[in-house]
Amino acid sequence: MSLTIPYRSSQFSVGYNDYDGVEAETGLRFRILFMKTGSEETISSRDYETAVLIIKGKGTIIYNDRECSFERSSWIDQNPVVAHFPAGDAVTVRAGQESRIAVISTLNSNQFKGKIYTPAEIDVEHRGKDILDGTCYRLVRLAFDRSIAPEPARIVLGEVLNFPGKWSSYPPHHHEQSEIYYYEFSPVEGYGHGELGDDVFKIQHQDLLVITDFRDHSQVAAPGYHMYYIWAIRHMKDNPYKGFEFTKPHDKLLI
């Protein structure tokens, strides 16, 4: 498996929409929770660490004694609300409007203190802005990694806003840990291309790319279309994700 397209440019069903086979390849389970106005959903698992990321919608997210309102009409210029919690805990989402939510999980019995990250707590990096004539300028939004989440956690999570006609995940780079990219486009008929080693895939709305085996994974959006993707990485046992390695000789582009 490399590119999975069960929901390409289609309407999600109400409830959970599972990207089958992804967990077997990466250790990460990825689902889209589609909620109608006025509905409520409690997200929990006895065995899985879980992250909940608001892609679009309006409502309230409740974790432990904290209640946090969210309203995100566009991923182009708004940061997400993200909840991250261990196995055994539960998050409740109440949808004030139709909402689309990513639910990322991994088997992990380790206990840690969960948290809700507000839009103001999302770290935004203007990566590539001043190099290569701005051709790989993008926004990288980090929800949490090893330096932010408690050490027993196994998920790293963030977003990329890939501007029209520009590259991201560039210069080419790789890492040992498995990763997934979930894509959306604005307008939704947009497309881009994703490299995976020597293979190149045409990416469309609601596709998911599985990245394994040290393969490079640079991306590019077609002119006229914003490309957005959620990226999630799973720490390996005794080998947590601490960053990527640029691929030679392309690393010289940064000198």
Where are each of the predicted segments found?
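Conserved metal-binding segment of the jelly-roll/cupin
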Residues: I76-G96, T106, I203-G224, I230-R234
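Double-stranded beta-helix
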Residues: S99-V140, E195, I230-I255
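Extended, compositionally biased flexible segments
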Residues: R31-I32, T37-R94
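Conserved hydrophobic/aromatic beta-strand scaffold that supports enzyme active sites
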Residues: F30-F34, A51, V82-H84, V103, ...
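A short glycine-rich, His/Asp/Glu-containing loop-to-beta-strand
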Residues: S9-T42, D133-I180
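Glycine- and acidic-residue-biased ligand/ion/polar-headgroup-sensing regions
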Residues: R46-E67, P164-G165, Y170, E176-L208, ...
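Short, structured patches in soluble enzyme cores that scaffold and shape functional sites
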Residues: A87, A95, V103-N108, F144-S147, ...
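Intrinsically disordered, low-complexity terminal regions
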Residues: S2-S9
